[in-house]
A protein has these predicted regions:
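Noncatalytic, basic helical substrate-engagement surface that gates or grips nucleic-acid strands
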Residues: 1-132
Length: 137
């Protein structure tokens, strides 16, 4: 979910200062839009989040190094942004009717893959799945 938000922020913010209220507004607006557009055909929203410490980094030390370099060259305060995103994630989990999934050591992609595999391999269960992601992989 954070990658979707970050993708939207990069398009919307341009040179505006980072604002917790703006980020929250964008997240809630996006979720409302997805629910309105897709809930009839795809059911409820399940929000998947990356854990801060991914298992891939243990095996591939240079995993996401390009991202780290790009962030260091950016004027955006990435620590502040991730703090805001974590706060909003907690608010969603505590105050909204969405299923919020975050698993120690896993990325959202891992969670999505396991859920998709489980649904597609369950006998007599056919369910359309829509995945919305800001990831490029």
């Amino acid at each position: 979910m954070n990658q979707v938000t970050i993708s939207n922020l990069m398009i919307q913010m341009k040179d505006e200062p980072l604002s917790e209220d703006l980020v929250r507004h964008m997240v809630l607006n996006s979720l409302r839009s997805y629910k309105t557009k897709f809930s009839k055909d795809f059911g409820e929203l399940v929000l998947c989040y990356d854990d801060k410490h991914c298992w891939r980094k243990d095996y591939f030390p240079y995993y996401k190094q390009n991202r780290k370099k790009a962030r260091s060259e950016s004027s955006l305060d990435w620590n502040e942004l991730f703090d805001i995103l974590t706060k909003i994630q907690n608010e969603l989990e505590e105050n909204f009717p969405y299923k919020v999934l975050k698993i120690n050591g896993a990325e959202a992609d891992d969670i999505i893959a396991i859920l998709s595999n489980k649904i597609s391999s369950t006998p007599n269960l056919y369910e359309e799945i829509l995945i919305i992601s800001g990831d490029k992989d």
